[in-house]
């Protein structure tokens, strides 16, 4: 089973919004064995060892009230520590492969919950936005955490994703959360509500113009931008080349630009040039919204 790369937040949707795209993927193969326990082998990028996937299985087994013997092989093609949901997609792909192999019917929210709790092994705390998008595909809103309530949309959107080749930031999630403001002015709060409303409305209508309005952010992104390599230049060059909006992908350092199809080539070239002028190597891809790992289950 295959799970797509994801980009969380998208500007104003901090911790509640993520989109699945086909820039990269993680794929998993599972064989059931006798006994109880999970044996995991990784190929490609290893997102923090097998703890993420192993814990995801443990949480799912607890939810189902039974333990299985599982041999899982995960082929992760999503660069790690780049804000692209690598660990979450690996866990989702493995759980989806297990569910198919075991012939089970499982509530998608239970899969997302198990994978999100498993991701705490890599991120330090549960994150449901990335794993929800990897599982369900399209664009996902976390409407509630307790109980976990997910809302999926299926917009047709095109992105340019820039992935700089930089050393991973130690304790990235902790650092990028530590810089967030503890208080915001009331007017900023109201403006942020308007933006995230536009973001969700844009998903519902598959309207890039509304999504672009929602990708503007005055709270989280300004605080994180100084910690994202080439942020200002990438953003400026992408917008000048025709991008509708630009945001940090997850906690970075990758960036994601929303584009019209006709402008994707020009924006991709502009982002490549921006990284090069900053002295950075980067992989820049044109991507579209993708289906999730649970689509056939």
From Swiss-Prot:
The keyword DNA repair does not apply. It holds the Pfam family GHMP_kinases_N. GO terms for biological process: threonine biosynthetic process. It catalyses: L-homoserine + ATP = O-phospho-L-homoserine + ADP + H(+). Its EC number is 2.7.1.39. InterPro entries: GHMP_kinase_C_dom, GHMP_kinase_C_sf, GHMP_kinase_N_dom, GHMP_knse_ATP-bd_CS, Homoserine_kinase, Ribosomal_Su5_D2-typ_SF, Ribsml_uS5_D2-typ_fold_subgr. It comes from Pyrobaculum neutrophilum (strain DSM 2338 / JCM 9278 / NBRC 100436 / V24Sta) (Thermoproteus neutrophilus). This is Homoserine kinase. Catalyzes the ATP-dependent phosphorylation of L-homoserine to L-homoserine phosphate. GO terms for molecular function: ATP binding; homoserine kinase activity. Belongs to the GHMP kinase family. Homoserine kinase subfamily. The keyword Nucleotide-binding applies. NCBIfam families: PRK01212.1-4. Keywords: Amino-acid biosynthesis, ATP-binding, Cytoplasm, Kinase, Nucleotide-binding, Threonine biosynthesis, Transferase. ATP binds at residues 79-89. It is found in: Cytoplasm. It comes from the Archaea. Pathway: Amino-acid biosynthesis; L-threonine biosynthesis; L-threonine from L-aspartate: step 4/5. GO terms for cellular component: cytoplasm.
């Amino acid at each position: 089973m295959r799970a797509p790369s994801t980009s969380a937040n998208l500007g104003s949707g901090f911790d509640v919004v993520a989109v699945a795209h086909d820039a990269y993927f993680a794929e998993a193969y599972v064989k059931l064995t006798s006994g109880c326990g999970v044996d995991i082998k990784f190929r490609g990028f290893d997102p923090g060892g097998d703890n993420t996937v192993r814990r995801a299985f443990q949480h799912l087994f607890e939810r189902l009230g039974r333990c299985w013997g599982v041999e899982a092989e995960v082929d992760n093609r999503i660069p790690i520590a780049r804000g692209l949901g690598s660990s979450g997609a690996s866990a989702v792909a493995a759980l989806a492969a297990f569910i198919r192999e075991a012939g089970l019917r499982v509530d998608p929210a239970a899969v997302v919950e198990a994978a999100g709790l498993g991701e705490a092994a890599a991120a330090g705390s549960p994150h449901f936005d990335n794993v929800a998008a990897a599982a369900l595909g399209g664009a996902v809103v976390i409407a509630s955490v307790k109980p976990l309530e997910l809302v999926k949309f299926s917009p047709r959107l095109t992105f340019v994703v820039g992935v700089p080749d930089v050393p991973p930031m130690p304790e990235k999630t902790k650092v990028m959360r530590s810089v967030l403001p503890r208080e915001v002015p009331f007017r900023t709060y109201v403006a942020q509500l308007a933006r995230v409303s536009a973001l969700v409305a844009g998903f519902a209508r598959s309207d890039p113009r509304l999504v672009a309005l929602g990708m503007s952010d005055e709270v989280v992104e300004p605080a994180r931008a100084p910690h994202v390599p080439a942020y200002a230049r990438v953003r400026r060059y992408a917008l000048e080349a025709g991008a509708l909006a630009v945001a940090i992908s997850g906690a970075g350092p990758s960036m994601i630009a929303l584009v019209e199809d006709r402008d994707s080539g020009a924006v991709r070239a502009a982002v490549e040039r921006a990284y090069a002028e900053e002295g950075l190597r980067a992989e820049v891809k044109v991507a579209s919204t993708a289906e999730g790992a649970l689509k056939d289950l």
